[in-house]
């Protein structure tokens, strides 16, 4: 007898309605809720999924390598990276006739192709790849790695090769392994690749499988390393006249501290990058020997955290705390076990760190690009900034989601009595109300300033605008070396201690050249009143998103309205039998509502980055400076003017190479708008609609020959909200992604 889906939940499998299908899909990855799941089995299944996850990433990379080698123009681009447009892949069947076929036959191709805006060409070129053959070899190597990963995932599900629960919970061993092996060795291995392959290639010296054992990466070999003369590796760096990829102006240094960027490639010096990675690798390997594992020496997390409490004789705060709260606190008692026994807590921390890193990458690629010539490919820069910022917001929302699930499923009040977690829960009203106050202050003041400026400009008196200079941010820029503001502080003052110390460092250094370059090159662009206002607008969005997420997590166990909320789970429905008036207070609902704010916030942040850079790249900073101080300036001079190019991708006079982006822009709007239908209409609407359709179906000839076993039941409100927020997010991303790429490409290619 065939088992009905889902096999992991007999309760759901026996549900006679369509709820069986949707709830089955919703809980497919919620391993904890599956029938017969033990803690050990849970860890083992998750461990195996890591191998699958890595395999998917590997297949993606291999697919990119293969398709660019097959259908791209990598070798032509390598010969002239500043003038040849990189091709992502061919378009096999361009619809809609000869017009679009001609429009998309671009970048020197003989057939319709897509232009590559992912930066992959720049990455592969920078790390030393030069030919299609090398791309094919890379794809094959990664495919072999993927096969090993898939085998490893399968193997670790077999009875003899399943790790034990104790192995998973040995936090010290895991930390040592992650620090020393995963971060330490891989950083040093990457330094090895840069020193042995990428840096020689950047100097016109090919290094491949045929000669990598015979080509010395440095004229003196390992002698300086073993004699302690490490400074030799920093001597004779590439000159400012170095032509990237050739020996012209090339030096011999492999580990430098030059600062700034390579004048021709616009990217960080490769020798600086190799120095960065070897330093991180060494620190990580030292860090990977800190925790007690095999030899009974080193730290344990439990001792560290238990020592951080005001009962401990060595705690410096014990007296002060007693005076303030009237009793001894147990700051970190129980925290180690709480984290070590909660996968949701660990995942929340990991997502928060990775989300922050993704946002950092977005900024880093614009301010300090590491790939050769990517700084001059403006469309790619804009696309990658947008891409990484959107990734960051979803990871951060996920961090708080799993924090909330931790409080519902894993938090033990007894084990955490009077420690820092318990205190956060006890003082949540103060935390939430303060955040609320900050949001209102930011929102009312920022909007009021914008609206005031809009009104006075509309009445023809722009001189009456309230324009606030961001003096604190300018102070930070000046402290880092920007001299245009006339603030003589730290590096902006040639006689300050940091400036004198920097001047005393041996060799040449180029940080000051970069920070004081023209706006389209400088990593610290000049800022003024428009930046001040949009900064506070973005701060409003960030604080409101944080407020919704933090409130959702801290109220996940219970609130004044619903003290026993934890008993209802993470995403309780509010449209079935049960408690009324609780529709917006599950922890899931907070994530759902925060996603809208997160999308709004990241749109504002990306609008800001994109418009300011468009102005800088076009040599017209005045447009941004004058128009960004009022809302109509943003609507008219950024959104409307840049949308016009995309909307022109389809018109009565024919089509152009922006047409695919134009259709994506339109389709994205439609998907986005569809979301509102699900967000506004609640369960009764869908149930009536479904019953009407069922009635019509059962009374229509031919159609009524097809029946179903599951009784059609409408979406719950939670499900409708999920469908709604998914359409909203996907539509938002498609619309803005198409906007960023098309509006930038129409100006710069």
UniProtKB/Swiss-Prot annotation:
Residues the record lists as binding divinyl chlorophyll a B3: 677, 685
E.C. number: 1.97.1.12
Species this chain originates from: Prochlorococcus marinus (strain MIT 9313)
GO terms of molecular function: 4 iron, 4 sulfur cluster binding; chlorophyll binding; electron transfer activity; magnesium ion binding; oxidoreductase activity
Subcellular location: Cellular thylakoid membrane
Transmembrane annotation, as ranges: 46-69, 135-158, 175-199, 273-291, 343-366, 382-408, 430-452, 532-550, 590-611, 658-680, 722-742
Gene3D superfamilies documented for this protein: Photosystem I PsaA/PsaB (1.20.1130.10)
Binding residue positions for divinyl chlorophyll a B1: 669
Protein name: Photosystem I P700 chlorophyll a apoprotein A2
Keyword Iron: yes
